[in-house]
Amino acid sequence: MSAHQVDTVTHASADPDAAQPFKELGLKDDEYARIKEILGRRPTDAELAMYSVMWSEHCSYKSSKVHLGYFGKTTTDEMRANMLAGIGENAGVVDIGDGWAVTFKVESHNHPSYVEPYQGAATGVGGIVRDIMAMGARPIAVMDQLRFGAADAPDTRRVVDGVVRGVGGYGNSLGLPNIGGETVFDESYAGNPLVNALAAGVMRVEDLHLAFASGAGNKIILFGARTGLDGIGGVSVLASATFDDEGGDTGGRKKLPAVQVGDPFTEKVLIECCLDLYKAGLVVGIQDLGGAGLSCATSELAAAGDGGMHINLEKVPMRATGMTPAEVLSSESQERMCAVVTPENVDAFMEVCKKWDVLATDIGEVTDGEHLTISWHGETVVDVPPRTVAHEGPVYNRPVERPASQDALIANTTAGLKRPETDAELEATLLKMIASPALCSRKWITEQYDRYVRGNTVLAENADGGVIRIDEKTGRGIALSTDASGRYTALDPYTGAQLALAEAFRNVAVTGATPKAVSNCLNFGSPEDPGVMWQFQQAVRGLADGCATLGIPVTGGNVSFYNQTGSTAILPTPVVAVLGVIDDVHRRIPTGLGLEPGETLILLGDTHDEFDGSIWSQVEHGHLGGVPPKVDLAREQLLADILLASSRDGLVTAAHDLSEGGLAQAVVEAALAGETGCRILIPEGADPFVTLFSESSGRVLVAVPRTEETRFTGMCTARGLPWTRIGVVDEGSDSVEVQGHFSVTMAKLREAFEGTLPALFG
């Protein structure tokens, strides 16, 4: 076969022994053999491209499927009651009442964001937004979970600058508010940053759309941007293998394929075009084109339908000349959608696309057969059973083994680490902690994002959870939070995942919303490492068991493996997103103190001497070891119930969860947010260091008007929730005072808290 000859099905049958680069495409010997067994011949070049991308770790979940099934086993019918779409769809969809539905999901774009930080992050946002669009919803907000190497490491500035500009540039151009997230710096993410993007959308329940191709004769319409060479191999090579640590400081870039290139303005009109198409009832089924491009869209639509599909591949609008069928099928060019449309609606469909200046092309049709066939200028280059491509890839039950080093890690507690003893040392610890890259203000980052575009943002960064209004008439809204702790998960993956769930659940609750559903993005090292698979297995079980205890379902998510450079893996990082519902956003609870004169500060929950895995141990001693804080999910539920009742009855004027940095961090953030000072009272007999810096879970700082203090504390006592009167808001005060120990002016706190990131990256 010459270099210019197309490898057709006829040719593949006639030349069964032709050498094929299946290993270069990420397939193993036995996987290639299985493809030949399925087809009864060797695959064509185009078929090989399809199977390689769809059987990649990123698309097939071949190493995680056996563990992800645990989510289904632990989800009850009661938990599923309000779930309209779940695991397996483009994004989860939840019925939130009054005829409204919300769809949300978290996705990773980790490896591309190291190779090309701006485009990697930008297209990560664009991809997750299209997942939301594909469910029939209008996207309304985005969030992000970012993990970078040490803040002062040489390459971190390049990655941070590109990623932050990419997230902001794409999201801002779409007109979507970025309402929160997390940014973490840790040396384990050097060379392997995590860029996890969340998007949420809203629709009426009856507007739900799903990805399936049914009805023989229905047309397949590709619409959006033209197809180019960008992103080819993204899921089979870039997202499904580790970065090579050879080659000096290249990070293995020489072997990596092109990163996708995004155009947010094309996506912006694509959103409006899709919404018009939905409103007109012109769409039977729809799928966005993201990872694996047309290979994914065609095989998944056909596999979910009731027949087959035929595609005329040469009709695909291309922006590069000389593209091969394999390249067209593998391209991950952005801003593209694929719809199933009845023949009588094609003209109307095209008119809507023309109105929005969106390129649309009829590229094929649904057939009454059982195969997906694809032709190239009249010659068949693909003839496959679509389920074997989309859903019946290899499944590996990889070895799972608790690392031998785990015992030593757990035994290495913080018990022997020096603690501050004097008042001066306590003050110095506070200032060092809030100025550290681990805890300092993310204002330098978040100010690059538009948080209030569209006018429906109620709470955003620096609140614990973001809140968006979805119904102007009733005030109904949603709250979202994403959280993760790689440090705790490294110590105990089961507990670490539950701590992330507990914090995200609590962050939604402190806004006054009721937590309803969960999405996740599970970021781990190589699945070929039994120790990594043990971490993954334990984290999945911890998260699933935690959701079952709280009674909220996992609606979907993402797994990102191979997050390591050479043999060095990232900290295991299960990102958990929680969606909550608030019936009236006017009763949301803000973070800042001082809404009413002389508020009483009350600490909800118990404080213990828990410092293993804490930010204090990291900042002061560069230490990681021991046992993470205990998690009590029943207490988290009680705490959420108390906060909901307090919001409805107007009993609290501010609330802030306690997590990294403990009470000291929460007080500083709440005081600076409200631009008012306060006095903190160390309980009699309590250790000031433990009181200020413990990271015990299940705690919230609330500000209560003096007139409501008796009523509020009485409710807590009656419900069995521990509470401690911990301080008072001093109206007009210019300092935060820990009574009897030290006092720091607000100006000094703000300088320490807000000066770090601009100095590093500004």
Swiss-Prot record:
Disulfide bridge map: none
CDD domains registered for this protein in UniProt: PurL_repeat1 (cd02203), PurL_repeat2 (cd02204)
Active site as annotated: H58, H109 (proton acceptor)
Keywords: ATP-binding, Cytoplasm, Ligase, Magnesium, Metal-binding, Nucleotide-binding, Purine biosynthesis
The UniProt record lists the keyword Metal-binding: yes
InterPro entries: PRibForGlyAmidine_synth_PurL, PurL_linker, PurM-like_C_dom, PurM-like_C_sf, PurM-like_N, PurM-like_N_sf
Residues the entry annotates as binding ATP: Y61, K105, N520, G557
Residues involved in Mg(2+) 2 binding: D131, D288
EC number(s) from the headed UniProt entry: 6.3.5.3
Protein name: Phosphoribosylformylglycinamidine synthase subunit PurL
Source organism of the structure: Rhodococcus erythropolis (strain PR4 / NBRC 100887)
